[in-house]
Amino acid sequence: MTKVAINGFGRIGRLVFRGLLDRTDLDIVAINNPSGPETAAYLLKYDTVHGRLNKKVEIDKDDLIVDGKRIHVFQDRNPENLDWSAYGTEIVIESTGKLKDKESAEKHIRGTVKKVIITAPGKDEDATIVVGVNENIYDPAKDDIISNASCTTNCLAPVCKVLNDTFGIKRGLMTTVHSYTNDQAILEKAHKKDPRRGRAAAENMVPTSTGAAKAIGIVIPELKGKLNGLAIRVPTPDVSLVDLTVELDKPATKESVNAALKAAAEGKMKGILAYTDEPLVSSDFKTTDVSSTVDSLLTMVMDDNLVKVIAWYDNEWGYSMRIIDLVAFVAGKF
């Protein structure tokens, strides 16, 4: 088993932890949570969105014990002070949301640590990988700092790949209707980057930026510069959707677009992309493992080559499952 540690025990860090508990190929040995083991245990055990963890959670000094498994809890904001090697850690999952550039993330690499997976879009990272789309680019010899991209890119990329491979994409625009996150405010306050994100998240639809569309050009190079988009944050705690409109190179119909997406969901992208023909709503996709679920009832085609596709995603749980998949993929190359 490959030994794994998590730096940062927020929304994504805790869900990745939950997922790792059931793996037989990956062994979670340590976390870093400056708030301490008591807070870590409490927030791990109780989750408003995804429910109570159905495992026994205990604390023993600086360790969590989950169903008898002991996991050490560091409490230090400086990555250079984290002795991951004391627990044989080989891969660090960097989920603080703060150490997103290569220079910061690679501070984890020393001793037994070989690779770092950033749970966000990176900066100057060695590779950005969306599992199911471009993991073939991974070079174990030189790619040590790897970004898992964003949850929205993980939803968008599989759909774009299928459409581009089948019909060709000339250009497109996307909107993510996205559940609010901890980057927003419950009540109004100043926001360091975007004044709209400082408005009350549970009371407003909040237009803001997303880098997901432009990031597609990193994951699928032939689409570089062909997509752009924005986000509308909405008053729900989890589950989002991508509304993608593209102009295609080849003529298409609603039936042919849906057929291509369904074939991918049942074939080469199974477990990454899913397909539904039921009239579902956001809560139906809570705690779904896939990156993206195409809502075939909402597919539209105009004038043979203007296409709209709607895809749902659990921006927390689905994304966390892809992080685990990426860790397992990287570990498999050791």
Spans of features found by a protein language model:
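N-terminal Rossmann-like NAD(P) cofactor-binding subdomain of oxidoreductases
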Residues: 1-198, 301, 323-325, 333-334
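General structural feature for long, well-ordered alpha-helical segments within catalytic domains
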Residues: 8, 16, 27, 104, ...
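Generic secondary-structure signature for well-ordered alpha-helical cores
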Residues: 21-25, 161-169, 179-182, 210, ...
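Short clusters of hydrophobic/aromatic residues that line enzyme substrate/ligand-binding pockets
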Residues: 64, 129-131, 145, 187, ...
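Short, solvent-exposed beta-strand edge segments and adjacent coil->beta transition regions
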Residues: 142-143, 200-202, 239-243, 306-308
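Hydrophobic alpha-helical scaffolding
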Residues: 149-150, 205-207, 313
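Catalytic core of tubulin tyrosine ligase-like
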Residues: 168-231, 237
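C-terminal active-site/capping subdomain that shapes the small-molecule cofactor and substrate pocket
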Residues: 229, 241, 245-334
